[in-house]
Regions:
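Beta-loop-alpha module in the N-terminal Rossmann-like domain of NAD(P)-dependent dehydrogenases
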Residues: 1-39
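Predominantly a Rossmann-like dinucleotide-binding segment in NAD(P)-dependent oxidoreductases
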Residues: 46, 54-134, 250
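A short glycine-threonine-serine/GTX helix/turn-capping micro-motif
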Residues: 98-104, 199-207
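Short polybasic amphipathic segments
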Residues: 166, 185-195
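A general structural signal for well-ordered alpha-helical segments in protein cores
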Residues: 6, 10, 33, 60, ...
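C-terminal helix-rich "cap/oligomerization" subdomain common to oxidoreductases
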Residues: 217-255
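Hydrophobic residues in well-ordered beta-strands that form the structural core
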Residues: 22, 48-50, 177
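Contiguous beta-strand/loop segments that form the cofactor/metal-binding neighborhood of enzyme cores
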Residues: 111-184, 203, 213-224
Length: 255
């Protein structure tokens, strides 16, 4: 579904008594995410989760483990890039009125990943956006996120050579992910560089969509909390909104 239909159809599904695994983003903006969050209170027995499938790939568990074990010291900054080229005027990603544009489509991954790894929320956001003159969608977006103890920067684009990577820089070393967000058909390599030495870990091919579906099914069967809460989804949308606002006003936004 296009992004503008995520909220109404999720609510329709809840009204029909269905659990919902909704593709990201959970809505068009933070206001819609908040509306859904409030709506779910009427259905305490139903599970709703935003589908950020990347978090279920085993490479992320390994990276989180490296960080929690202190292998790179304290995180100082995270850098991420996610780009592809799509100039098809009929593609939903290039239609402004229904939630097209790079930030909602792929920039949300960069923001989500930074928050996930830092286990914190940014307090200040600065954004720069380039609009497509024909589609009026954001074809290029960059952001600087200031967290309490670190920073994160990202760039996403719908009209650039396809690329994705993520680096985590710490006080004692850094981690690099070569295909952080959708290594669906291939194995992938994550590396840790410290004191002039490099450790590479080859992560075997895994379908993170399947793993996500399995995890969601498990929480339904066992009546457990969903792995990615709606509070998390709302927080991510607030940062996305702040990137848009900052670019429009050409000034940082405090959260």
């Amino acid at each position: 579904l296009p992004n503008h239909l995520h909220l109404p159809w999720t609510i329709k599904a809840l009204e029909a008594g269905k659990h919902v695994l909704c593709e990201k983003p959970i809505g068009m903006n933070a206001a819609e995410a908040k509306q859904l969050f409030e709506a779910t209170k009427k259905y305490p027995d139903l599970k709703v989760m935003e589908a950020f499938m990347y978090r279920f790939h085993p490479q992320w568990k390994e990276v989180k483990s490296w960080i929690s074990e202190g292998k790179i010291g304290d995180i100082k900054t995270i850098q991420s890039v996610f780009t592809y080229f799509n100039a098809d005027p009929d593609n939903i990603r290039n239609k402004a009125g229904i939630g097209g544009g790079g930030l909602l489509d792929i920039g949300c991954y960069c923001i989500s990943a930074s928050r996930y790894l830092l286990e914190a929320e940014p307090t200040k956001v600065y954004g720069e956006i380039e609009l497509d003159p024909d589609f009026n969608t954001d074809r290029m977006a960059s952001g600087i996120l200031t967290f309490p103890k670190a920073t994160a920067t990202f760039t996403c684009s719908t009209q650039a050579s396809p690329e994705q990577h993520l680096k985590v820089f710490g006080t004692e070393g850094f981690i690099e992910m070569e295909i952080p967000f959708n290594p669906l058909e291939n194995s992938c390599t994550i590396s840790l560089k410290k004191n002039g030495e490099e450790i590479e870990s080859k992560v075997m091919q895994a379908n993170h969509y399947t793993l996500q579906g399995d995890a969601f099914s498990k929480v339904i069967l066992n009546n457990e909390p969903v792995p990615t809460s709606l509070e998390d989804a709302l927080s991510n949308m607030r940062v996305i909104d702040a990137v848009f606002e900052s670019s429009k006003n050409q000034s940082p936004v405090r959260l």
